[in-house]
């Protein structure tokens, strides 16, 4: 997205009007728990008031137990959103149990747990998450 004046406005009630891009690249500003933002794919797609946020990153250097990534659109304030990750790596090892993502009400970031509870990631080595995060805004 560009910080520019909008010109040539048009309205469409279709979910994906002709020539309208469905996925937008995104660079998270918040990346808590890594020494630098891991390289990879961060993109989102909005339909109505639902955001689909695709995260597919490479291993990054862990520097904290709390693991969070900024979101492209602030979450709605009516509920907490949560789901399972497609892949998670902690201290260089692929986790064999399910990891999860959580978005609190009105949050601007998504938090990751290394299990389906509140388990935090190791503060050293490498870590990685892969998830399709779906939430209302």
Name the predicted role of every residue range:
Residues 1-4, 44, 99-105:
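Broad, structure-driven detector of short, well-ordered beta-strand segments within folded domains
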Residues 1-23:
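Beta-strand-rich solenoidal segments
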Residues 9-10, 124-126:
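Solvent-exposed, conformationally flexible loop/turn segments
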Residues 24-48, 56-77, 116-125:
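Surface-exposed ligand/attachment interfaces on beta-rich extracellular proteins
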Residues 64-66, 72-115:
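Extracellular attachment/recognition segments
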Residues 125-137:
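Short, structured beta-strand segments at or near domain termini in extracellular proteins/domains
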